Amino acid sequence: MTASVLLHPRWIEPTVMFLYDNGGGLVADELNKNMEGAAAAAAAAAAAAAAGAGGGGFPHPAAAAAGGNFSVAAAAAAAAAAAANQCRNLMAHPAPLAPGAASAYSSAPGEAPPSAAAAAAAAAAAAAAAAAASSSGGPGPAGPAGAEAAKQCSPCSAAAQSSSGPAALPYGYFGSGYYPCARMGPHPNAIKSCAQPASAAAAAAFADKYMDTAGPAAEEFSSRAKEFAFYHQGYAAGPYHHHQPMPGYLDMPVVPGLGGPGESRHEPLGLPMESYQPWALPNGWNGQMYCPKEQAQPPHLWKSTLPDVVSHPSDASSYRRGRKKRVPYTKVQLKELEREYATNKFITKDKRRRISATTNLSERQVTIWFQNRRVKEKKVINKLKTTS
């Protein structure tokens, strides 16, 4: 005795979609156990269907639980076996299922993953719904439910309608651990399923839609590289002469253009520019030189420690040269000094003040002149002694 099942063309073979956790853990172990249990249940259902078919038409209790129809049991076994085979390392397109089957395949937040018995029952219910729809010639009660299940995946509906069957995509098709099914809520079992694209073109469109693969433009990379070289290495690969400098500081070109007329080598100089105005540089330098508006005179290098002594710029210049310039005395001054020296070679304090007032010389100058005059006279006397 043989049994055959004719499925309606718009009903696709129901499969189960499992999502593997990248990190492993309890969820992955539980799913592996459930898949093994589903495979065992599928094998038991197939054996029961074969025994019932070979025993003269008496159905097995497992087949009777599926509705007493051998074709339904065989379809359930085939569906469970296909689910067990396609779940590992594959992500297949979920078929539109009945409400009961859909609730069996998906787990709500806070609930444990479906067990092996629940998976087998869901597969049997889906096969029974498919058989009922095919025998009645219409969508049956599962038609609206299938439409609602198909509406749940609105982003991928176009890709699902363009295919005639489930297209399996390998694990890691879109990259390292990328899943097009987003997790809803903090619970690891709260999963929102989404249909997979069925062809290569649809897969590419799906990746373009849900993955941001567009990188920065080549111009942006080149401009960033030029800016990096300009500010950190000092080489300008283009006319970067209108950039905005940092507030309070300026960039001065220290070397003329090396690569061409529109290129220059810049080295940032930390100079405050509160009171600076730009001056154009000659010789075609691509830049500006900043000079202070008001050139303040530098302070004198030497200042007297005495409060009554006032330093002059001429004195400062003389001290910078190391020796004050010799000022020759006038004939009137020399005549007055020689007259007083002839009277007395050593000058007194009162005479020094009087000579200083008469000759318009300082007392120190008068004293030094008398000292030098005595030394000169001594030299002349010594020379006369040596010659005679």
Swiss-Prot record:
<dbReference type="InterPro" id="IPR051003">
    <property type="entry name" value="AP_axis_regulatory_Homeobox"/>
</dbReference>
<dbReference type="GO" id="GO:2001055">
    <property type="term" value="P:positive regulation of mesenchymal cell apoptotic process"/>
</dbReference>
<dbReference type="Pfam" id="PF12284">
    <property type="entry name" value="HoxA13_N"/>
</dbReference>
<dbReference type="GO" id="GO:0097152">
    <property type="term" value="P:mesenchymal cell apoptotic process"/>
</dbReference>
<dbReference type="GO" id="GO:1990837">
    <property type="term" value="F:sequence-specific double-stranded DNA binding"/>
</dbReference>
<dbReference type="GO" id="GO:0060847">
    <property type="term" value="P:endothelial cell fate specification"/>
</dbReference>
<keyword id="KW-0371">Homeobox</keyword>
<keyword id="KW-0238">DNA-binding</keyword>
<dbReference type="GO" id="GO:0048844">
    <property type="term" value="P:artery morphogenesis"/>
</dbReference>
<dbReference type="GO" id="GO:0006357">
    <property type="term" value="P:regulation of transcription by RNA polymerase II"/>
</dbReference>
<dbReference type="GO" id="GO:0001886">
    <property type="term" value="P:endothelial cell morphogenesis"/>
</dbReference>
<comment type="function">
    <text>Sequence-specific, AT-rich binding transcription factor which is part of a developmental regulatory system that provides cells with specific positional identities on the anterior-posterior axis.</text>
</comment>
<dbReference type="GO" id="GO:0035115">
    <property type="term" value="P:embryonic forelimb morphogenesis"/>
</dbReference>
<dbReference type="GO" id="GO:0045111">
    <property type="term" value="C:intermediate filament cytoskeleton"/>
</dbReference>
<comment type="subunit">
    <text>Binds DNA as a homodimer. Interacts with MEIS1, MEIS2 and MEIS3.</text>
</comment>
<keyword id="KW-0805">Transcription regulation</keyword>
<keyword id="KW-0804">Transcription</keyword>
<dbReference type="GO" id="GO:0048619">
    <property type="term" value="P:embryonic hindgut morphogenesis"/>
</dbReference>
<dbReference type="GO" id="GO:0000785">
    <property type="term" value="C:chromatin"/>
</dbReference>
<dbReference type="GO" id="GO:0001570">
    <property type="term" value="P:vasculogenesis"/>
</dbReference>
<dbReference type="InterPro" id="IPR001356">
    <property type="entry name" value="HD"/>
</dbReference>
<keyword id="KW-0539">Nucleus</keyword>
<comment type="similarity">
    <text>Belongs to the Abd-B homeobox family.</text>
</comment>
<dbReference type="GO" id="GO:0030510">
    <property type="term" value="P:regulation of BMP signaling pathway"/>
</dbReference>
<dbReference type="InterPro" id="IPR017970">
    <property type="entry name" value="Homeobox_CS"/>
</dbReference>
<feature type="DNA-binding region" description="Homeobox">
    <location>
        <begin position="322"/>
        <end position="381"/>
    </location>
</feature>
<dbReference type="GO" id="GO:0048839">
    <property type="term" value="P:inner ear development"/>
</dbReference>
<keyword id="KW-0225">Disease variant</keyword>
<dbReference type="GO" id="GO:0140014">
    <property type="term" value="P:mitotic nuclear division"/>
</dbReference>
<dbReference type="GO" id="GO:0001894">
    <property type="term" value="P:tissue homeostasis"/>
</dbReference>
<dbReference type="GO" id="GO:0060442">
    <property type="term" value="P:branching involved in prostate gland morphogenesis"/>
</dbReference>
<dbReference type="GO" id="GO:0030539">
    <property type="term" value="P:male genitalia development"/>
</dbReference>
<dbReference type="GO" id="GO:0043565">
    <property type="term" value="F:sequence-specific DNA binding"/>
</dbReference>
<dbReference type="Pfam" id="PF00046">
    <property type="entry name" value="Homeodomain"/>
</dbReference>
<dbReference type="GO" id="GO:0003281">
    <property type="term" value="P:ventricular septum development"/>
</dbReference>
<dbReference type="GO" id="GO:0045840">
    <property type="term" value="P:positive regulation of mitotic nuclear division"/>
</dbReference>
<keyword id="KW-0217">Developmental protein</keyword>
<dbReference type="GO" id="GO:0033574">
    <property type="term" value="P:response to testosterone"/>
</dbReference>
<dbReference type="GO" id="GO:0006366">
    <property type="term" value="P:transcription by RNA polymerase II"/>
</dbReference>
<dbReference type="GO" id="GO:0000978">
    <property type="term" value="F:RNA polymerase II cis-regulatory region sequence-specific DNA binding"/>
</dbReference>
<dbReference type="GO" id="GO:0001501">
    <property type="term" value="P:skeletal system development"/>
</dbReference>
<dbReference type="InterPro" id="IPR022067">
    <property type="entry name" value="HoxA13_N"/>
</dbReference>
